[in-house]
From Swiss-Prot:
Domain of life of the organism encoding this protein: Bacteria
Upper lineage: Bacteria, Pseudomonadati, Pseudomonadota, Alphaproteobacteria, Rickettsiales
UniProt signal peptide: 1-23
InterPro entries from the UniProt entry: OMP/PagP_b-brl (IPR011250), OMPW (IPR005618)
Entry protein name: Putative outer membrane protein RF_0060
Source species of the chain: Rickettsia felis (strain ATCC VR-1525 / URRWXCal2) (Rickettsia azadi)
Amino acid sequence: MLRIVKKLGIILFVSSISINSFAKSMYDDVDSAPDYDSTPYYENEGSLVFKMRLGGVFSSAKQKGLPTPTSPQPVPVGEVAKNGYGGDASTTIFFNNYLATELSLGFNVLRTKYTSLAAVAHNYGVNNVKLGKNKPIYMIPATVTGQFHIAPYGGIRPYVGVGYHGSYMLTQATGLKIRNGHGLVGQIGVDFYAKDDTLINIDVRQFFLNPKLEYKPNLVGTKTVTSKVKLNPLIVSIGIGFTF
């Protein structure tokens, strides 16, 4: 009988230790579990987002439609402009969590290439022309874009868009005039929300733009030479935004 009591006592003692250890481990697990109530939750409080961006402009600037050269020994014309830089300001209007429209106004700079202008002057009758100081091509696009926000909740929110732009074109390069243009725009980007009302934006937009070029008589002789240039600039930007 005494042996049985001793065995029962040992079993109860070991059981109590085991239960106490299990309860302590459960308490520690609960205590170390994440507090979901305190996890940051990003949600738009307003239907407007204002953004300011700076970025690089990448363009091949290939010409097409040039007339037959008058020079007996023509040379390749090549690209009329180099890559450049620019920036824009935009306002995004949300209709719901997924659909929005972005209105933007930009200012971009493309550097003209001396070699291209000199080649045009050589091919169409004016050699040894003084090109003067290198003057850039300015592109000022006003753009309307419809956007679809793929994941509108959380701190990382990607989006895609398609729209249309009208671009005011300007240059003071010697003997060169560029006409205004317009075309489609494709867009992809992502917003990183730092706080409920502040975000970092990375944006990529492909502009389709083929404006008309006019080479003036002081560069090409007695008559104006016209062509089209396939600018189609790709603009990669980073910026900051605020929700309202």
